[in-house]
């Protein structure tokens, strides 16, 4: 996180260039927005309250990198990130999801993110605790003596305590088993472990969904009042390790502090990406579905503007959450949004359609290029996959031409073409004798020629 905080806008753009081809203006806009957040944190408190994020509206066809830019930026900055579709929401009073739920979902993501980080910090200690529990299950007689209660003074007094020699022998045996456990010799041994299980109250009839919209988590409230039961389960040592590690890790985490950190992170570093904003940007005719679409815009306005939303973890202010709106705006224009909402997305960037050259670069340059992914996947079967320059050019050309003839779905068409070209290799990989496979222009055309020539077929398959 600290390393990212030291990145300049130019360096942020260079980081994004590793995964997304082109779209410099969009990368520049998000880099400035994130850098301004870092600048804001260095200001005196009085100025921090005044400086609000400048929300961004990305305009461009599908498959050109709008979502990927926002997602990669969130990963780089360690920010809680949520993508939602504007069309999923309905106006308050209608059946469906209210726009407030996006803030609650963001907080949930933030809590899970912080919890995961805290669990990673205590992993070593938790692994030691798991090891002790597994040893207790493997050698029950070596367990540490439990604290004797007042009543136990009368009932347990008759029980014979092990002699010093027996205790020494048990300790030695425990250490021998511990060594075998660490060497991985007992992974398939069956053991019986006790797991605490909370009794979940049945609350379906009480309308939990509606209560969550008010920031009330009835399940947790009632669940804390219910007794916990201990359930015995038989499983292998390796399964027990996977089961017990999160349980023991949670015991070491201060969840109150983790929750406070998560709320602060969601409020000050959260990013909400609202896709399909163009679908609700329709000039109202005063009746029909347009009324509901305008209602969703009006409901979005206070959240984007800055308000306080109640969540089950506590109140969350949306003033400093960065909102990135997105849409193709083929059938509508940004000016079709209600004026107040337009004003809340002051930075507008237009993403250009991808060219044939862009497709070639997408297949070669990104660190996660689909060609590199397939080379890595098939290398597990001992196959060396080689893409020649003319093979790459041919796939890019076919994808570009299909986008022109059929619907333009951007880079997604390219992925469909590559999948079709490599379909047979992926299927036959375990059985092929020739372990070096060259994907050139001739090979590509051999796999796609019949499909491309028949427009009806290509519209379904590619």
From Swiss-Prot:
Question: Main site of residence?
Answer: cytoplasm
Localization of this protein:
Cytoplasm
Alphabetical GO biological process terms = protein unfolding; proteolysis involved in protein catabolic process
The signal sequence is: none
Binding of ATP occurs at: 21, 63-68, 275, 340, 412
**Gene3D superfamilies (alphabetical):** 1.10.8.60, P-loop containing nucleotide triphosphate hydrolases (3.40.50.300)
Q: Which Pfam families match?
A: AAA (PF00004), AAA_2 (PF07724)
InterPro entries, A to Z: AAA+_ATPase (IPR003593), ATP-dep_Clp_protease_ClpX (IPR050052), ATPase_AAA_core (IPR003959), Clp_ATPase_C (IPR019489), HslU (IPR004491), P-loop_NTPase (IPR027417)
Q: Which GO terms describe its cellular component?
A: HslUV protease complex
Q: Name one GO molecular function term.
A: ATP hydrolysis activity
Oligomeric form and interacting partners? A double ring-shaped homohexamer of HslV is capped on each side by a ring-shaped HslU homohexamer. The assembly of the HslU/HslV complex is dependent on binding of ATP.
Its annotated function is as follows: ATPase subunit of a proteasome-like degradation complex; this subunit has chaperone activity. The binding of ATP and its subsequent hydrolysis by HslU are essential for unfolding of protein substrates subsequently hydrolyzed by HslV. HslU recognizes the N-terminal part of its protein substrates and unfolds these before they are guided to HslV for hydrolysis.
NCBIfam families from the entry?
Answer: hslU, PRK05201.1
- Give the matching PANTHER family: ATP-DEPENDENT CLP PROTEASE ATP-BINDING SUBUNIT CLPX-LIKE, MITOCHONDRIAL-RELATED (PTHR48102), ATP-DEPENDENT PROTEASE ATPASE SUBUNIT HSLU (PTHR48102:SF3)
Which family is it part of?
Answer: Belongs to the ClpX chaperone family. HslU subfamily.
Put simply, this protein is called ATP-dependent protease ATPase subunit HslU
What organism does the UniProt record list as the source? Pseudothermotoga lettingae (strain ATCC BAA-301 / DSM 14385 / NBRC 107922 / TMO)
